[in-house]
């Protein structure tokens, strides 16, 4: 899976975290592991321009998605395996997202992870134009975010335990040559 990130926003964000959450969602949604995704981070002026040009709406927004190939999660079990495809582009505005994060009482990293999930789901055909669609998409988005955060916490705890184990073994000189 290829995920490219281009940060043109002027705001320092963890590209590694963005790739991690995108990769997690793509995997959970059974998208071909050879799929490609492009993520672009823009400042508010550039995002406002894009928002007006594509959605005919004034001002910046938090996330926009531009699907390339029509991909859907899962599929019929007897269907032939689709080949790798270009999912599309997700455009994020960290400055706008920071305002939303402050209003919601969580970190910019949390907000960008949420918006990345939102963007990937749009690329996979999910929408929130109708109440039923919104309920389905937002429930899935929340579940995926919760699962990704749990996976990150577990990996962090495992890394800490591995480090403690390594230090203990070093102190015991268990691996010293006789």
Swiss-Prot record:
UniProt-annotated location(s): Cytoplasm
Sequence ranges of Basic and acidic residues compositional bias? 159-178
Write down the Gene3D superfamilies for this protein, in alphabetical order. Answer: Metalloproteases ('zincins'), catalytic domain (3.40.390.30)
What EC number(s) does its UniProt record assign?
A: 3.1.-.-
Which Pfam families does this chain map to? YbeY
Q: Where does Zn(2+) bind?
A: 118, 122, 128
Recall the GO molecular function terms of this protein's record. Answer: metalloendopeptidase activity; RNA endonuclease activity; zinc ion binding
The terms describing its cellular component in GO are:
cytoplasm
Q: Which PROSITE patterns match?
A: UPF0054
The alphabetical list of record keywords is: Cytoplasm, Endonuclease, Hydrolase, Metal-binding, Nuclease, Ribosome biogenesis, rRNA processing, Zinc
Q: Region Disordered: what ranges?
A: 156-178
Co-factor note (free text):
Binds 1 zinc ion.
As cofactor, the record names: Zn(2+)
Can you tell which superkingdom this protein's organism belongs to? Bacteria
Question: Alphabetically, which GO biological process terms does the record hold?
Answer: rRNA processing
Cited function: Single strand-specific metallo-endoribonuclease involved in late-stage 70S ribosome quality control and in maturation of the 3' terminus of the 16S rRNA.
PANTHER family for the chain: ENDORIBONUCLEASE YBEY, CHLOROPLASTIC
Which family does the similarity line name?
Belongs to the endoribonuclease YbeY family.
Which protein, by its recorded name, is this?
Answer: Endoribonuclease YbeY
Q: Which organism is it from?
A: Mycobacterium marinum (strain ATCC BAA-535 / M)
């Amino acid at each position: 899976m290829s995920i490219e990130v281009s940060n043109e926003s002027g705001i320092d964000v963890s590209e590694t975290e963005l790739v991690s959450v995108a990769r997690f969602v793509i995997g959970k949604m059974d998208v071909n592991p050879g799929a490609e995704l492009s993520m672009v981070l823009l400042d508010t002026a550039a995002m406002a321009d894009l928002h007006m040009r594509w959605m005919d709406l004034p001002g910046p927004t938090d996330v926009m998605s531009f699907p390339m190939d029509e991909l859907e999660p899962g599929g019929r079990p007897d269907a032939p395996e689709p080949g790798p495809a270009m999912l599309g582009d997700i455009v994020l505005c960290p400055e706008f997202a920071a305002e939303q994060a402050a209003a919601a009482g969580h970190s910019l990293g949390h907000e960008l992870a949420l918006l990345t999930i939102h963007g990937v789901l749009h690329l996979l055909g999910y929408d929130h134009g109708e109440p039923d669609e919104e309920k389905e998409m937002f429930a899935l988005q929340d579940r995926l975010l919760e699962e990704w955060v749990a996976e990150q916490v577990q990996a962090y705890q495992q890394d800490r335990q591995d480090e403690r184990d390594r230090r203990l073994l070093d102190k015991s000189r268990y691996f010293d040559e006789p």
